[in-house]
Amino acid sequence: MSLISNNEERSLRVRYCIAIALSALLISGCTTLRLPNQSTSVYHQQTWAQRYYDLSRISQWNIDGAFSIQQPGKTIIAAYDWQQKGMNYRIRIHSSLDIYSVNISGRPGMVTLWRSPRQHYTASTPEQLMQQQLGWQLPLSNLYYWIRGIPAPGAYQADFDTYTHLIALQQSGWHIRFSQYTTVGSVDLPRTLQLSNGPLAVKIVVKHWQ
């Protein structure tokens, strides 16, 4: 579904406005989203097989935080709220003052992006849809796994710390570093992820895990 020229111009203006509005989030993100130091003594010592089993069983969560995307000539910064139930999800991407907001809802084979209650678009993958409508994308299909600190299905190379936390991962052309974990209940979950793929660099901060 293509937009008429007036809508394209309005979309470009909105994208320009969000870049300005969200620059404040980029500046404040280093402070308001700075994570407290956590003693490694609270971490759970497990074998990788045990840790992978526990993390792979998590299929429902509510998380929020912020992310930044840096690519040649463009920097995107936004906050997000991510609700996951099984393979179905809803993600709201918004500015700190809600000047700009989009909603992405998906299930296997069908993803919808909502700009407003009457303006929505669909695609078969979230990456395709975000690139078409936002001009940038996050690897959401794989982040379903990476956000829990486990590899997605398929070939990968990984490094672990002494607690068997995944700290570095190469998969599907991406290099992922897990620079901080937090203990939630009986499991340790990522707080900060740094992803790179060629000239594209992404940082994701999880502020709250539920």
From Swiss-Prot:
Transmembrane segments: none annotated. The keyword Coiled coil does not apply. The keyword rRNA-binding does not apply. A lipid is attached at C30 (S-diacylglycerol cysteine). Disulfide bonds: none annotated. Keywords: Cell outer membrane, Chaperone, Lipoprotein, Membrane, Palmitate, Protein transport, Signal, Transport. Residues 1-29 form the signal peptide. A lipid is attached at C30 (N-palmitoyl cysteine). Pfam families: LolB. Plays a critical role in the incorporation of lipoproteins in the outer membrane after they are released by the LolA protein. Belongs to the LolB family. Monomer. This is Outer-membrane lipoprotein LolB. It comes from Coxiella burnetii (strain Dugway 5J108-111).
